[in-house]
Each structure stands twice: as C-alpha cells, then as structure tokens.
Amino acid sequence: MTVPLKRIDKIRWEIPKFDKRMRVPGRVYADDVLLEKMKSDRTLEQAANVAMLPGIYKYSIVMPDGHQGYGFPIGGVAAFDVNEGVISPGGIGYDINCLAPGSKVLTEHGYWLKVEELPEKFKLQGVKVYNLDEGHNDTSNVAFVAEREVETGEMAVRVTTESGRIIEGSEDHPVLTPEGYVYLGNLKEGNLVIVYPFEGVEYEERKGVILDEDAFKDEDPQVLSFLREKGLVPLRWDDPRIGTIARILGFAFGDGYLGEMGGRLTLTFYGKEETLRELKKDLERLGISANLYVRESIETTSGHSEGKSLSIELRVTSRSFALFLEKLGMPRGKKTEKAYRVPGWILEAPLWVKRNFLAGLFAADGSIVEFKGNTPLPINLTQSKSDELAENLVEFLGDVAKLLAEFGIETTLYEVKSKKGVTYRLSIVGEDSIRTFVERINYEYDPEKKVKGLIAAAYLKLKERIVKEAHEAVKDDFPTFEEFAKERGYEGGFVAEKVVKVERVKPEYTKFYDIGVYHEAHNFIANGIVVHNCGVRLIRTNLTEKDVRPRIKQLVDTLFKNVPSGVGSQGRVRLHWTQIDDVLVDGAKWAVDNGYGWEEDLERLEEGGRMEGADPDAVSQRAKQRGAPQLGSLGSGNHFLEVQVVDKIFDPEVAKVYGLFEGQVVVMVHTGSRGLGHQVASDYLRIMERAIRKYRIPWPDRELVSVPFQSEEGQRYFSAMKAAANFAWANRQMITHWVRESFQEVFRQDPEDLGMSIVYDVAHNIGKVEEHEVDGKKVKVIVHRKGATRAFPPGHEAIPKIYRDVGQPVLIPGSMGTASYVLAGTEGAMKETFGSTCHGAGRVLSRKAATRQYRGDRIRQELLNRGIYVRAASMRVVAEEAPGAYKNVDNVVKVVSEAGIAKLVARMRPIGVAKG
C-alpha cells in the first residue's frame, strides 16, 4: 500500500484520511532520513490502519524511532475514548516469529495445509496442538494468521532431524524440545526436538452436495427440521465437519449398531470407556448428545461373545441423527445378518475423507500395531457374517482394501476359522505398508491404539532412513520398538528426535508466516515438529568516571555474574508459578517488601511501580509458568545493563533536580516482563480474535485485533496487562538490588554511601487510562504506547513530587555503544501526543540482518578500542545489537526536542555493557 504524506514542517508529517475507513489522520514525527526508513517497511501503513479503529482521538501517531511492528507500528501512540474506544494487545507490545512458506500445518482431520494457504481457509480449520500440561495431542481453532516480508539479505534456518523431517523458518521461531522452547537459530546438532509422527495427506477441495433434503422427503418433517437446525442437511463436501462425520461412520461400521430399541430407532456404539468418550466429543461437535451406559456384556452385533463381563455403550437417542447415518450408508440391524458395502460417497471422496473413515473403522475393528523385536507384525481387520453373506463380506473387505491401496498400502485377504458363520481377515502386510498406515491413516478414538501407532510411525521412519543410508539391514544394536518407545516416546504419541543438521539458507521466497491458536498450549505442528512488555530504569551514583574506569571490567563482570541474563535466563529467586500472584498485584512494592530495595525507590517509579487493578486471575497458568522462573532476570536481545557516564548537560536546572552532573557514573537497566508479558499478549490476541466479530469492529489488518475497552474481554485484558507491567517493575526492582550489591562488591562501600538512588523508571510498552484535552474538552482515554514513553509536563499530579516543578524524567536508551539521553516531559507533548514521546533509537536492521552484516567478536573489539567493555552471553547477541543496526539516537531525540514533545536534559555515553 502506498501511503500519502503531507509535510507540515521540517519534522512533522501528516497521513491524510486517504482511506474512507480512517477516522482521524496520521501524525508522523521524523526528519527526512528517519522517514525514508519508515517508508521501507509497513510503518506508515500500520499507522493508517490504527487510524481506522473506533473511538480514536486526534491522530494515529508515529514517533521518530518508529518501525514496523505487529499491528501497531513500534514507536506508535494512539488514544481511544474509554467508553467508545478499543484496546489492542498489538498496540501495547507483541512480536511474531515465522516459518517458511510450504511448511505443512497438520489439522484435526489428518490432512495438512501449507501455512501460506491458511489465511484463506483458517476459519474452517482446527489444527493439531501439543497439550504440554496434560501430555497429549489436542485440537484448536486458528486464532490468526500472520505474515511478514523476508528482509533483504535475511537468512532462514533449516533444521533436519534424524528421520529426515525438515523445518525452515526465521532464526527466532520457537521449537519445542524436551527442555522447553528453543529458537530455531539456537538449535545445534545432537539436540532433541519434539515431533508428532503422523503425516496425514494433502488437503483436496471438493464442491457439491453429498446428501440433500430430498433424501428425507418420506420421513417425519421433524427429522428434516432437526437436521437443518444442526446444519447437517444439505451436507456438502466443503462442510468443515465432513472429516468428523466420516470417522464416526467408519467407527459405526465396526462397533456401531443402528436398530430399534424399545420401539424407537437408536444408534449405539460399543467399546472401551476411553474410546467412547473420545467418540462422544466428536458427536458433540456435531451438536448430537449421547449418553454412556455400563451394562452386562452380551454377544455384540459383530457376533463376538464377550462373556459375562461389564461393557460400556454410548447411546444416541436422536432418531434424526440415526436416519442421517443410515442415509450415509450405515446398515440398519445386526450387521452380521445384513449385506452392505463401503458407501459410494466414501469411495468417491477426497483422500483425506477416506483417511478419516478408515481411521474410525480400524479404531473399532482393527488390531493394535505390535512388534517382534524391531519388526512390525501385520495389522488385521477382522469381520464376521452369517454363512449366506460370505460373498458380501469379501466384497466389503475388498472395498476397504481398495481404499488402503490408494494410500500405497498392500493387503492380503483370507478366511479364518470361526465357530459361527464365516470370518475373514484383511491384513496389512510388509513394513512399508504398515509404516504408511500408521503415518497417514492411523487410528482415531482409541487412545491406546493411536499412541502406539504414532510412536510406531516414528520408529519405522527412523529405521527406514537408517537402512536407506547404510544400504543394509539395521544392526544388532538398533533398539527394539519397546526400547525406543520407552526412551523417546511421550504421552499423546509425541516423540523426541535428534537434530542431525542445522543450516543457514537463503530464502527462495519473499514472506514468512505464523499462526496463532486459541488453545492454551499456543503451539501447532509444522512438518511434524511442534513449534510456537518493557521499560527502562536509571540509577545514579556519586562516583565519577575517574573512580570507575580502572575497575570497569571487574564491575561489568560482577554485574554479569549477579544479574541472570540470556535467552531463557532464569532468576536467582525460585518461586513456583502458584506463588507469583502477589508479584502481579504489588509489583515493585512486593520486591521492596521482600528486601529488594529501599522504600524511597517506589517514589521514583512510574505508577509507583504498581498499577492498581491488576488481576492475577486474568493471567493464564501458562503465562505464570513462563514468568515465575524468569523473575529477577535480564533476558536477551536489546535488554541490557549499561554503566554510563554523563558527558553533557543541556539543562543544568532540571539536571540538578534529577541529581545528575557531568562526569557522573550512572547505570541504565532495560528489561521487562519477560515470557509472562509475551504470553499475556498471545493469550488475549486469541481471545479477542474470537470476540471481534461479536462486536463488529472494523478489522483493517489481521494483526490489528481489538475489542471495546469496556467489554468483558477488554477489561480482563487490561487487568492482565497491568499484572504483566507489575511483574516488569518487580523484575527491574530486583535487578536494581543486585546492581547495588555488585557496586558494593567492587567498591567496598554501601550502596547508600555510593548515592545509588533511582532517578526514574518508565514503561514503554503499556496502556494507560489518562485524562487529556481534545478539542477544548477534558476526556478520559486509554492511551496505547507501543515503543513510546510517557512524557508528562511540569505540574502534572502523576509525577513524583520531587520532579513536579520540572517535568517527568524521560529515559531514552541508545543502541549498544552509542549515547543515551535523559529528557523531560513538556506541555507540547500533552497538547500534541497525549503526553508521549519516543523510547529509543529504533531498529533499521532486523536481528537476522545484523548477524549477517556484523561479527560479534569484531564489534566487541571495536567497542573495547573506544573504551567500552562488553560482556555478553553470546557473540551473536553482540552482532544483533551492533550500533549500526539502529537509527541514530541523536537524530531521534533531536526531532522530539525540535517538536517540543520533550526537552533535552542530559546525555550519557557507555563505558561498560552487560547483555543477555
């Protein structure tokens, strides 16, 4: 999209309401150089999209450090009426990590779609997920599909497992391992990843009607009325439930009975309780109720005697649904005494529909996969009929054999002895055919058969690859199936596979894709592999560069030791996820109450380090589980601890109030709510995606999901966001405590004697309810600041009393090795930008692009030559955060200063950096 721009002055630009959906114009703060970068991505388009949201006031604003984000631009500000407006997680902070096009996403019906096909079809699809908490596979509807451009020169990561599975995506796409999620780019040869061995078949679209209303013209009108109400008639090939119907029918051909019971046509299923409970879920998806009964076993409809034991039956009392299945080919009466064939519509169906029918049939009457050592035994489908129907039985099993042959599965058919009637057995024989069956068809409903079949699929795929590569049979030390299942198998049929190759490859495509799911597991299965808030604080000292320079290496190394950092880093405090509710409610106060800081610290934090109204119950268990071990840790990427020297004072009067002087050593901390905050955003994106149609909110961009602020979903998200913000303040408070301890360790003085007070702490990914003036009237708004900082002017009651006469301190971190700034809030910001200004330098290169252009060891040496000592968890992070990967922060602060939306107070240059 080409976004028109109108120049207002040297550093202000307007995006006119060029699209009739825009409710307000856009306002961009940038010089010519900064604007060119915004034009190179979707920053301006995203700003225009934000201007379309209900309840927005004045402008959709982009700060000079703005760049493309998720939904909202990073560096974006928007204020919405608290009664008529919306709230959006994308406007507060969220990122996407992506897969290559062509990645096969497995759906609930056992077929796969390429990830890039999902935007058109996702409303109808349920995808397979791995329920981490319960340890089994599950199904979830898709919440959203995201895409982003492959950046110029960006490399993808291609990972190959020992069985030959390949996944390709961006370096930061998370993949599940036995130890948790790991970025694709961080995987190494020999690592284990979690795979779902089922491969399924490709989706095939089919149009037309399978069963129309004429089929019921001779039935009671109530039957047709019921089936219409359930959306089952007319039944079309493109009905998203057709796979469900096919597998129910398949199971019914095995362990189902359609017949009169008490003078009423009834449908009954027999089997193990856990099997019938799974079947019951599918019936309920169709809107059909069924009841489980425990009864004394009698001879079943298939003719097998079970003796006098208890059996379970699942009974559907809906006559309409029983007739529905009959019209689809289900025989009425005792199947051993009825002639029937596989229904014609199944024989004509796309392969994925046939797969569902067969998976249901084999769940009922097929044998479980068994092994002798490392060799699979035949999988058998055995059925019986009365003697006079022997030919029909052979024909029926012949139909099944033809279906299997379409998958490349070979079978043999033979008669077996039986005391009553005639019995035939259809056997899947040969290792290749057995592997194909468990990989592409498998079993539905019966958990025991299904799980064993999945692990068998992984085992046989690995065995096949080893045989092909070695050109000989597997050796004696190759594990038996039982050994493999015990060592590599997980509940739900998931398996751990070893990574054998990790490559950086040049993408032969232009876009990456990702999907979000509603399920709390927040993952999906691609190519068989399970895949998946912030702020700044400034601490002053009474030390000068002359005091610190001789000990800078020791100081930074001590900070690196005492403050946990890096991808997935965990804090020094061990809290179980059930124990962090107090942290989510009390924020920095919790930390101070528990000995991490001083009471006076709370007076120098935005919101006092605690937002009122945080509700820990609005935060998911998964978010708490991610956050608990990370409390008190820095993280990675652009998060840092930096020892800085104040090298220039622009406003001596304000600097004096802030406690800053030239030559002074200060410490800047940049980190946030870690995995907890990201999970909160993920959770509510999915919730809001579900709700957005209910509220009929315009949806100009699939990433720009929002709900009315006053809605139940909006208020619940706001409460969860507050909890995440409180977690972030507690996190920075604990880090502050360890920074003070580190200075004490190096300089042998108490932190109090070193004057280690907090200057201020600001959030820059947050939503706030504030009062602002619009068109001469005071209005309450929910201000979204995504990569933007609050900048309130002198006299504002939200500013700490010690700073109220001069305005709120605004902390602007630069990139690694460049200057950072302290600014002060202004009246200009209140009038133009809802009391907001920029938040940092803003990236010009993605992390991936930076690692291609820079080498971490060289950057570190260059910085050392300039007197800046860097200690990092990896050289890759140093390359990602190279100064050249960011905009010139001097230009950014110059723009906001010239615009009058912040006032320059002081500049700091780094002398030591600790990074994750």
Swiss-Prot record:
The EC code for this enzyme is 6.5.1.8, 3.1.-.-
The catalytic site is made up of: H839
Listed binding positions for GMP are 638-642, 764-765, 813-816, 820, 839-842, 915
The free-text function statement in the UniProt record for this protein reads: Essential for tRNA splicing and maturation. Acts by directly joining spliced tRNA halves to mature-sized tRNAs. Joins RNA with 2',3'-cyclic-phosphate or 3'-phosphate ends to RNA with 5'-hydroxy ends.
Binding positions for Mn(2+) 1?
D95, C534, H639
Q: What is this protein's name?
A: tRNA-splicing ligase RtcB
Catalytic reactions on record: a 3'-end 3'-phospho-ribonucleotide-RNA + a 5'-end dephospho-ribonucleoside-RNA + GTP = a ribonucleotidyl-ribonucleotide-RNA + GMP + diphosphate; a 3'-end 2',3'-cyclophospho-ribonucleotide-RNA + a 5'-end dephospho-ribonucleoside-RNA + GTP + H2O = a ribonucleotidyl-ribonucleotide-RNA + GMP + diphosphate + H(+)
Q: What else is known?
A: Ligation proceeds through 3 nucleotidyl transfer steps, with 2',3'-cyclic phosphate termini being hydrolyzed to 3'-P termini in a step that precedes 3'-P activation with GMP. In the first nucleotidyl transfer step, RtcB reacts with GTP to form a covalent RtcB-histidine-GMP intermediate with release of PPi; in the second step, the GMP moiety is transferred to the RNA 3'-P; in the third step, the 5'-OH from the opposite RNA strand attacks the activated 3'-P to form a 3',5'-phosphodiester bond and release GMP.
Give all residue intervals belonging to the DOD-type homing endonuclease domain. 248-409
* SUPFAM superfamilies in UniProt: Hedgehog/intein (Hint) domain, Homing endonucleases, Hypothetical protein PH1602
Task: Give the classification, highest ranks.
Answer: Archaea, Methanobacteriati, Methanobacteriota, Thermococci, Thermococcales
